[in-house]
Amino acid sequence: MSLRLPSLSFTWLTRLSWSWRFTWVYLTLILFIPIIALFLKSASLPLGRIWELATQPVAVAAYEVTFGLSLAAAALNGVFGVIIAWVLTRYDFPGKKLFDSFIDLPFALPTAVAGLTLATVYSDKGWIGQFIAPFGVQIAFTRWGVLLAMVFISLPFVVRTVEPLLLELEVEAEEAAASLGASPSETFWRVILPPILPGVLAGVAQGFSRAVGEFGSVVIISGNLPFDDLIAPVLIFERLEQYDYAGATVIGSVLLLFSLVILFVINALQNWSSRYNG
Amino acid sequence: MVAFVKARRQIAGVKESKSLLPLALIGISLLYVGLIIIIPAANVAVQAFSEGLSGFIKNLGDRNLQEAIRLTLLMGVISVPLNTLFGLAAAFAIARKQFPGKSLLLSVIDLPFSISPVVAGLMIVLLYGRNGWLGPLLESNDIKIIFAWPGMALATIFVSMPFVAREVIPNLEEIGTDAEEAASTLGANGWQTFWRVTLPSIKWSMLYGVVLTTARALGEFGAVSVVSGSITGKTQTLPLFVEEAYKQYQTTLSYTAALLLGGISLVTLVLKALLEARTGRQSRIH
């Protein structure tokens, strides 16, 4: 008996070891070789040229717009995401199920459609834009539009990471805090927020990462003006259209490096979150 | 007023709270999601029918739109089976083994989700484009990948790669090996065990992954846009068609294509909810 079990599971694995080989071949062809192609292309340029291309003023302005607005969008969704997750886990109201499924729409709706409809609704004559235009604020084709598109596509992340954490939270702790005389805001800051904070931050980081890389919705709603509302992915696209492969590659490598760093951060936050919640 | 608030609170199912807080929080949530998601979503349908049903049907007959539909379906037909196969293979290779670097490998599989679609497309251009690493080799053999469907398919495969793997891996870890070992003991070979025991127990998570893969494959814009050149009627998928028609001021035509894509995403959400109900799991996004 003691011999049988290991040998059984072992034959099972060896018989399916095609899976191991297939996985590596597929990853190599689809993922590794393209990534290496990008870095090799960057590395084939002289170091000074790389620096020059990576830090040219139009690129630096594009990084600022991209990272700044993505961070703003992620932070906004951090605040509202917690509220929405709270509402979904604690309250009942008519149409809640429908409301719940709308949260996932940004994830299912193609980004081009999102950009198109946001650009229409928030244009000067659009359903919502017409009420904002009199205040002198134009949303479509400005930085506000870019921010709006980024808010749209990164909205689900915080909601969906915080929801399960709120479900696990013990209501007793809140009730105890309240019965000991804590105000709702004290209860929130001292009792509710600490255990969900790593999850909130992980969701914010995911949303941030998604917003930084976003192209489809932003390119449609943005005016794509350099030094104004041009984001880095659109700049890469334009460089490619002008057959400036070196420029596209270097800016692309900057974004890729950023993705790798933020992936590491998200992993660390998720580990922290799961440790926190046992 | 007091009666009204009381009634609202009962609807909200909050009885002991004396404050207006729940109502306010529900209101804020509805307003936020309404302004950012629900109203824009409703706008897609309204705009698509802005010339009435007959206008919508006439637009559906547009030759370039139909070509875009065909190409979009082709992207799905190519990338969904391949990525499903990969997801299953990766799950079998990884899920039940403990080895150093396992969590790193799982992160690597997730990489396409964190790489900007434009950068993904750029990588494929640098590899297969005319000035790319394999460019001369492909050109001398008369194989066209960039500005043609094979490159678009590669881009689509890239961006939708992780879905099945990341759904099936945790599922496979969860179900354990008892049933398979029993099947083996009863004389089933590897493939019999796979088809009769393993596959049925992971089919829902696999389907969940397939639904998400399909939605992404049919809706991808950035990566496909970079490699396709977006030539109307030739290398234009539906999402590219949406942008192009909008830029050409054919707004209603653009919204016709957008509504088709919106319909796909509605179906996705419904299937997703059904599968979540069946597997009893929380909604997850990527």
From Swiss-Prot, chain A:
Induction: By sulfur deprivation.
Membrane topology, from the record: Multi-pass membrane protein
GO molecular function: ABC-type sulfate transporter activity
Record's GO cellular component terms: plasma membrane
Residues in ABC transmembrane type-1 domain copies: 63-266
UniProt-annotated location(s): Cell inner membrane
Pfam families: BPD_transp_1
Statement: the UniProt record of this protein carries the keyword Cell membrane: yes
Coiled coil: none
InterPro entries recorded: CysT_permease, MetI-like, MetI-like_sf, Sulph_transpt2
Transmembrane residue ranges: 22-42, 67-87, 102-122, 139-159, 188-208, 217-237, 246-266
Keywords: Cell inner membrane, Cell membrane, Membrane, Stress response, Sulfate transport, Transmembrane, Transmembrane helix, Transport
UniProt keyword Transport present: yes
SUPFAM superfamilies in the cross-refs: MetI-like (SSF161098)
Main location class: membrane
Function according to Swiss-Prot or TrEMBL: Part of the ABC transporter complex CysAWTP (TC 3.A.1.6.1) involved in sulfate/thiosulfate import. Probably responsible for the translocation of the substrate across the membrane.
Family named by the database record: Belongs to the binding-protein-dependent transport system permease family. CysTW subfamily.
Subunit annotation: The complex is composed of two ATP-binding proteins (CysA), two transmembrane proteins (CysT and CysW) and a solute-binding protein (CysP).
PANTHER family: SULFATE TRANSPORT SYSTEM PERMEASE PROTEIN, SULFATE TRANSPORT SYSTEM PERMEASE PROTEIN CYST
Record's protein name: Sulfate transport system permease protein CysT
Gene of this entry: cysT
From Swiss-Prot, chain B:
Membrane topology: Multi-pass membrane protein
Pfam families the record matches: BPD_transp_1
UniProt similarity note: Belongs to the binding-protein-dependent transport system permease family. CysTW subfamily.
Subunit structure and binding partners: The complex is composed of two ATP-binding proteins (CysA), two transmembrane proteins (CysT and CysW) and a solute-binding protein (CysP).
Triggers of expression: By sulfur deprivation.
Function description: Part of the ABC transporter complex CysAWTP (TC 3.A.1.6.1) involved in sulfate/thiosulfate import. Probably responsible for the translocation of the substrate across the membrane.
Organism: Synechococcus elongatus (strain ATCC 33912 / PCC 7942 / FACHB-805)
Name listed for the protein in its UniProt record: Sulfate transport system permease protein CysW
Gene Ontology terms: cellular component: plasma membrane
Cell compartments where the protein resides: Cell inner membrane
Transmembrane segments: 20-40, 74-94, 108-128, 145-165, 207-227, 255-275
All copies of domain ABC transmembrane type-1, residue ranges: 69-272
